[in-house]
């Protein structure tokens, strides 16, 4: 099967609908309904194709279609549904009674899409301004006040450091003096101990020498005693030997 010829080749009209054509279509659908859109134009006596009759009825001639501009609630609903469903205009139209998919598509592309982009750009600008303001340096007065506060803090810190260093130097000098004093008196005590120890050693040496002298004297005395004793005994032996000879 090839492609069906267009409406012009078979003698059908295209373009805007006239008021007479709208009246014929409304009367026929009101009496017979629309069970078959392809056969409806011939039965109604219209030189239109079935698709054109269907779109004309659904988008413009239905009695339950809302006329006029979209309300803010409807616009917000379309925006939220478009974020969820995308370009599914029939599904969006099913959530909005009285609004057609073609009408919703037209209002989206002509009005809502631009408004959404504008609000997004505005939000981006506000975010950029807020981040830029947060990153920008403060005013000269604030800078001067902050620098004065910083200088005051640094001055106080330096003064505290100087006082702490003075205290540390004073405590260190006191510690040094205490150490020197302790070392001095310890040296004095050691010297006294050395002197007393030397005196004791000298006394021990003198006593030892005296004992040696006494021992020598006693030894000499004993030697003299035994020498005298031996010599006297030898004399006695000699006298006795002389007596025995007589």
Swiss-Prot record:
It is found in: Nucleus. Residues 9-61, 62-116 form the HTH myb-type domain. Expressed in roots and flowers. Expressed in shoot apex, axillary buds, at the basis of flowers and branching points of inflorescences. One of its GO terms (biological process) is regulation of flower development. Residues 37-61, 89-112 bind DNA. One of its GO terms (molecular function) is transcription cis-regulatory region binding. Induction: Induced by abscisic acid (ABA), drought, light and wounding in leaves. Down-regulated by drought and ABA in roots. SUPFAM superfamilies: Homeodomain-like. GO terms for cellular component: nucleus. Keywords: Developmental protein, DNA-binding, Nucleus, Repeat, Transcription, Transcription regulation. The keyword Ribosomal protein does not apply. Gene3D superfamilies: Homeodomain-like (1.10.10.60). InterPro entries: Homeodomain-like_sf, Myb_dom, Myb_TF_plants, SANT/Myb. Its main location: nucleus. CDD domains: SANT (cd00167). Plants expressing ectopically MYB13 display peculiar hook structure at pedicel branching points, and a reversed order of first flowers and axillary buds. Plays a regulatory role in meristem function. Functions as component of a regulatory network controlling the establishment and/or development of the shoot system by the regulation of apical meristem function. May play a role in tolerance to boric acid. This is Transcription factor MYB13. It comes from Arabidopsis thaliana. The lineage of its organism: Eukaryota, Viridiplantae, Streptophyta, Embryophyta, Tracheophyta.
């Amino acid at each position: 099967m090839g492609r069906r010829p267009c409406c012009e080749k078979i003698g059908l009209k295209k373009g805007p609908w006239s008021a007479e054509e709208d009246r014929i279509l409304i009367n026929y659908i009101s009496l017979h309904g629309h069970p078959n859109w392809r056969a409806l134009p011939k039965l109604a006596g219209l030189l239109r194709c079935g698709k054109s009759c269907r779109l004309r009825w659904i988008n413009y001639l239905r009695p339950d279609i809302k006329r006029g501009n979209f309300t803010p609630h409807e616009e917000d609903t379309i925006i939220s549904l478009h974020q969820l469903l995308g370009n599914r205009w029939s599904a969006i139209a099913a959530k909005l009674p009285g609004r057609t998919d073609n009408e919703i598509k037209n209002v989206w592309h002509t009005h809502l899409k631009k408004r959404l982009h504008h609000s997004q750009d505005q939000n981006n600008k506000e975010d950029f301004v807020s981040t830029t303001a947060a990153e920008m340096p403060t005013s000269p007065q604030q800078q001067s006040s902050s620098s004065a506060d910083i200088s005051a803090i640094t001055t106080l810190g330096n003064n505290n450091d100087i006082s702490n260093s003075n205290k540390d130097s004073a405590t260190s000098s006191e510690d040094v003096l205490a150490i020197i004093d302790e070392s001095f008196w310890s040296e004095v005590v050691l010297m006294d101990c050395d002197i007393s120890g030397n005196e004791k050693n000298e006394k021990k040496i003198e006593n030892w020498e005296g004992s040696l002298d006494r021992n020598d004297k006693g030894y000499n005395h004993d030697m003299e005693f035994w020498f005298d004793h031996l010599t006297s005994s030898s004399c006695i032996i000699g006298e006795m030997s002389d007596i025995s000879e007589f």
